[in-house]
């Protein structure tokens, strides 16, 4: 194992010594400045469908919440937790709808039969 490792190291050293050293190429200069400059910190812009920009004031920070107080919108609550009675009524409605669909299918099957 030592002989294989020594041979490999010698081969790499020989290959490295035989290649002339070339300095790395310099990075190309950018043709144009990249990106857009950021707007000043206290100014926010609201974007609309029109191409114009309108400045919008920032909300004041709430002292108790830090920067989280700047967000004044409430999180919408679409559906509350249903009560046990509401869950039972829902399951009854689903069961009745499935039963009616099954009976409708059976009725159509009987009517389609030829005697």
Swiss-Prot record:
GO terms for biological process: vitelline membrane formation involved in chorion-containing eggshell formation. The keyword Signal applies. PROSITE patterns: VM (PS51137). Residues 35-72 form the VM domain. It is found in: Secreted. One of its GO terms (molecular function) is structural constituent of vitelline membrane. Keywords: Secreted, Signal. Residues 1-17 form the signal peptide. Major early eggshell protein. Belongs to the vitelline membrane family. This is Vitelline membrane protein Vm32E. It comes from Drosophila yakuba. The gene is Vm32E.
């Amino acid at each position: 194992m030592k002989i294989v490792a020594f041979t490999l190291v010698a081969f790499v050293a020989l290959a490295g010594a035989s290649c002339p050293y070339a300095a790395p190429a310099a990075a190309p200069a950018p043709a144009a400045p990249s990106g857009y400059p950021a707007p000043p910190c206290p100014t926010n812009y609201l974007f609309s469908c029109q191409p114009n920009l309108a400045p919008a004031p920032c909300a004041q920070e709430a002292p108790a919440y830090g920067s989280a107080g700047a967000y004044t919108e409430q999180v919408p609550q679409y559906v509350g937790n249903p009560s046990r009675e509401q869950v039972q009524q829902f399951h009854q409605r689903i069961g009745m709808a499935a039963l009616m669909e099954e009976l409708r299918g059976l009725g159509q099957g009987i009517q389609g039969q030829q005697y």
